Amino acid sequence: MLGIVIPAHNEEACLPGCLAALYVAASHPALRGETVLIHVVLDHCEDGSEDVLKRWQQRRQSACVALSWSQIDKRKVGAARASGANRLLARDVRWLAFTDADTQVSPEWLVQQLALEVDVVCGSVAVDDWSPHAGQAAMLRTHFSQTYNDRDGHRHIHGANLGVAADAYRKAGGFQSVPCHEDVYLVAALERIGARFAWSAAPRVVTSARTDARARGGFGDTILAVVAAATAAL
């Protein structure tokens, strides 16, 4: 079995698109019907995120894809990812794939992670809509295209596009219960145990450039820092 973990904090608006993409990826013919467990960890959600999941579970039936969710009250993305991973490991999954609620994976996402035949896959991200930043959108699009290395051999670490073999995850100790950089800390732990890595641009995801980032210090805040620096330079 394969497992996918998605942390969510007030993601009512983004979850439908995220789940739709995950169901397609989890149903890819190349997986040959292997069961894929999708687990969403609702962390201090005060919106209709759980209602979205309930409706989705009722309407989308699949022989090889199962959706579940749990709730925590930590406001820490590291705690959410760790909680979801532990639940899936208890179901004996062999591979853990991680993404975010504001991210949509490609149809080949899981297949391409597994095809690399390593312990850890660190993928890159793409942004296709910079409009939340209004007047700064063109500048951000240009800055991202010029500075972001979206090729094999990159050294980006994104919780929105990460895959880890279950055995390696256990050996490394899993995610730390931290509010941000949990992905960076996990990758460092995986490097220390000698895990085999692929720094690949093959497994594709598209993430948002929203201005109301959920994890302080994460990708969204990095974008806001670029905007702030550009504004200060004017």
Predicted segments with their positions:
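Short, well-formed alpha-helical segments that are part of the catalytic scaffolds
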Residues: 11-28
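Acidic helix N-cap motif at the loop->helix transition within catalytic regions
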Residues: 13-16, 47-56, 108
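A conserved acidic beta->alpha catalytic loop
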Residues: 41-51, 103
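Glycine-rich, basic loop-to-helix element that forms the pyrophosphate-binding segment
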Residues: 71-90
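Short beta-strand-to-loop acidic/aromatic patch adjacent to the donor-nucleotide binding site
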Residues: 91-104
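Conserved donor NDP-sugar-binding/catalytic core segment of glycosyltransferases
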Residues: 108-135
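Short, flexible, basic/aromatic active-site loop/helix in glycosyltransferases
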Residues: 123-124, 136-155, 227
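Acidic donor-binding loop at a coil-to-helix junction in glycosyltransferase catalytic cores
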Residues: 180-186
